[in-house]
UniProtKB/Swiss-Prot annotation:
It comes from the Bacteria. HAMAP family: LysA. Its EC number is 4.1.1.20. This is Diaminopimelate decarboxylase. It comes from Helicobacter pylori (strain ATCC 700392 / 26695) (Campylobacter pylori). The active site is at residue 329. Gene3D superfamilies: Alanine racemase, Lyase, Ornithine Decarboxylase, Chain A, domain 1. Specifically catalyzes the decarboxylation of meso-diaminopimelate (meso-DAP) to L-lysine. Pathway: Amino-acid biosynthesis; L-lysine biosynthesis via DAP pathway; L-lysine from DL-2,6-diaminopimelate: step 1/1.
Length: 405
């Protein structure tokens, strides 16, 4: 059992705490699942892009799935090799494309014909051949939250089969494009294996057709999306996921690229917060804590439910339903409704569980609240991996503008 009390002697709440041993094991589980075939596990930085987490994964020979030039430079800074980096995203700017090509990353996942011709023009100006992959939208329902579904025709991501074929043929004829991969990603927090296998089989069939047309594919990029159990719900077994994809690739000599994010880091993270007040309003019990929706947005944005437990001794206190809420001036600043918690006092400490993914990476300074301290637990030792922002950091980049006032 981890001794939180020692932690509270040196660090004030709220803060994030990550168990690096859990991250390491989660990544190694992916490597083991795909070991029967040439594969590259590209961690999706969007889930959590802390440099120390990236460095840990770099030492395990992880690749990186990046969706901005900032994420690419983060990956490189942490030691991930350029030839293990893929650049995804529906809205890459010309500057980002140029930088990515100059850095000689593995390839760019292309989302539209217009983006393809933009990459071609930039590659021509640089006098190089751009390695590209085309993201195919298989029009398959991932059966997940609509905000994180990406594989239906009404979603903004990828292109249909007909347009993908036209794009591949265009790239094949171009002196400045080199099509090396097919790509799909139907959504995040997936709990049903069937849509993933269906998409994999559909795109594998397309890949075979492309190879028959003389397109020299080398990679099969399956995206990510395996969900984690936030509320004890059924999740996809990694072995079944890997075997389903491997079976769909029979007859294809391609390296599999998998882009997990949430399933690598989610369960490693805790948000430690303390009670400021208890209040009752018209017989409704509220527990007000010092963390807010700016620190952890998922419950407010997705109505996501994360278990909350009390780590301050509370034996003998009466348990009753309550809403755990933050101090931000929004009614949506709620971490959990109808949580069954004991009567709490100011200073009592709570843990919000499984916040390693899309926690700190989605945090903001809303309400002029500094971003949180982040700590790592590794080999039974605690170290700081991101300092808490100071109040002065909130306006540091704005001070120059005051000189003209």
């Amino acid at each position: 059992m981890f001794n939180y009390e020692e932690l509270f002697q040196t660090h004030k709440t709220p803060f994030y705490l990550y168990d690096f041993d859990k991250i390491k094991q989660a990544f190694l589980n992916y490597k083991e699942a795909f070991k029967g075939r040439k594969s590259l596990i590209c961690y999706a930085l969007k889930a959590n892009s802390n440099l120390s987490i990236l460095s840990l994964l770099a030492h395990l020979e992880s690749g990186a799935d990046c969706v901005s030039i900032g994420e690419i430079y983060r990956a490189l800074k942490a030691g991930i090799k350029p030839y293990r980096i893929v650049f995804s995203g529906v809205g890459k700017s010309g500057f980002e494309i140029e930088q990515a090509l100059k850095l000689n990353i593995l390839f760019l996942n292309v989302e539209s014909f217009m983006e393809l011709t933009t990459i071609e023009t930039i590659a021509q100006s640089l006098g190089i051949k751009a390695r590209i992959s085309i993201r195919i939208n298989p029009n398959i329902d991932a059966k997940t939250h609509p905000y994180i579904s990406t594989g239906l025709k009404e979603n903004k991501f990828g292109v249909g089969e007909k347009e993908a074929l036209e794009m591949f043929l265009w790239a094949k004829k171009s002196a400045f494009l080199e099509p090396v991969s097919v790509h799909f990603h139907i959504g995040s927090q997936l709990s049903d294996l069937e849509p993933i296998i269906e998409a994999s089989q559909k795109v594998a069939k397309i890949a075979k057709s492309l190879i028959a047309l003389g397109i020299d594919l080398r990679f099969f990029d399956v995206g990510g999306g395996i969900g984690v159990s936030y509320e004890n719900e059924e999740t996809i077994k990694l072995y079944d996921y890997a075997q389903g994809i491997l079976n769909s690739l029979q007859g294809l000599d391609l390296t599999i690229i998998c882009e997990p994010g949430r399933s690598i880091v989610a369960e490693s993270g805790e948000l430690i917060t303390q009670v400021l007040y208890e209040k009752k309003a018209q017989n409704k019990r509220f527990v007000v804590v010092d963390a807010g929706m700016n620190d952890f947005l998922r419950p407010s944005l997705y109505h996501a439910k994360h278990a909350i437990r009390v780590i301050t001794p509370s034996k003998g206190r009466e348990i009753s339903p309550c809403d755990v809420v933050g101090p931000v001036c929004e009614s949506s600043d709620t971490f959990l409704k109808d949580a069954h918690l004991p009567e709490l006092e100011p200073g009592d400490k709570l843990v919000i569980e499984k916040v390693g993914a899309y926690g700190s990476s989605m945090a903001s300074q809303y309400n002029s609240r500094p971003k949180l301290l982040e700590l790592a637990l590794e080999d039974h030792k605690i170290r700081v991996i991101r300092k808490r922002e100071a109040l002065e950091d909130l306006w540091r980049l704005e001070e120059e503008g005051l000189k003209g006032v």
